[in-house]
From Swiss-Prot:
PANTHER family: PECTATE LYASE F-RELATED (PTHR33407:SF9). GO terms for biological process: pectin catabolic process. SUPFAM superfamilies: Pectin lyase-like. Coiled coil: none annotated. Residues 1-28 form the signal peptide. InterPro entries: Pectate_lyase_PlyH/PlyE-like (IPR004898), Pectin_lyas_fold (IPR012334), Pectin_lyase_fold/virulence (IPR011050). Disulfide bonds: none annotated. The gene is pelC. This is Pectate lyase C. It is an enzyme of class 4 (lyase).
Length: 221
């Protein structure tokens, strides 16, 4: 582990003082040919490992038939991983899940998709270069993102188009830049978003379809 001017370099993850992580480009990639399952209640600690998807999983485009690099089951934790390009369909969560210091260098179809009901918390990490959305919510859930950096995407968070289930979205201490459409887009009148202590710039309309938004101590720059 190395320290540099307020940062910590840990096996390929450059983690700044706010817990946000950026990748070290020099780290060699390991090719994943079959989805890695983080089983119920278990923790997968990549220790800074950099992974890319093999052709069996997908090419990282917007094709809907791609498979994830990680499947995170109920009560499981994924941490300290860098996902390079191609990232196929990123990470799928099933139930309650913790995602800590995961970096998406070049978002594939999506960075992360909520596939079943639960509470998902993303703490630390970063994502960039998403052709469409970064995070996709497909089931009723509480979805929390904190200490995260996102740059260049269509939407930071998108609830499944046309769905009416309730998603409770919390965004705290994030930096969000260069979104073409919005920070959060939903078609559900029952979903809500709370954003606090967050810096943002060039994010389109900020909210699309959101009926319940709470904002505190944010800064547009």
């Amino acid at each position: 582990m190395k320290r540099l001017a307020g940062t910590v370099i840990l096996s390929g993850l450059l983690v700044c003082g706010f817990g946000q992580a950026l990748p070290e480009k020099a780290l060699a990639a390991e090719v994943v040919h079959k989805t890695i399952v983080v089983e119920k209640g278990q923790t997968y600690d990549g220790k800074g490992k950099r992974l890319i998807a093999g052709p069996e999983l997908g090419d990282g485009s917007q094709r809907e038939d791609q498979k994830p690099i990680f499947k995170v089951e109920d009560g499981a934790t994924l941490k300290n991983v860098v996902l390079g390009a191609p990232a196929a369909d990123g990470v799928h969560t099933y139930g309650n899940a913790s995602i800590n210091n995961v970096v998406w260098e070049d978002v594939g179809e999506d960075a992360l998709t909520v596939k079943s009901e639960g509470s998902v918390t993303i703490n630390g990490g970063s994502a960039r270069l998403a052709a469409d959305k970064i995070f996709q919510i497909n089931k009723a859930s509480t979805f929390t993102v904190k200490n995260f950096t996102a740059d260049q995407g269509g939407k930071f968070i998108r609830q499944l188009g046309g769905s009416t289930f309730k998603a409770v979205v919390n965004i705290d201490n994030c930096t969000i830049t260069n979104m073409k459409e919005a920070i959060f887009r939903t078609d559900s009148s029952t979903s809500s978003v709370t954003m606090t202590n967050t810096r943002y710039s060039k994010v389109g309309q900020k909210w699309i379809g959101v009926k319940h938004a709470t904002e505190r101590n944010n800064h547009e720059f």
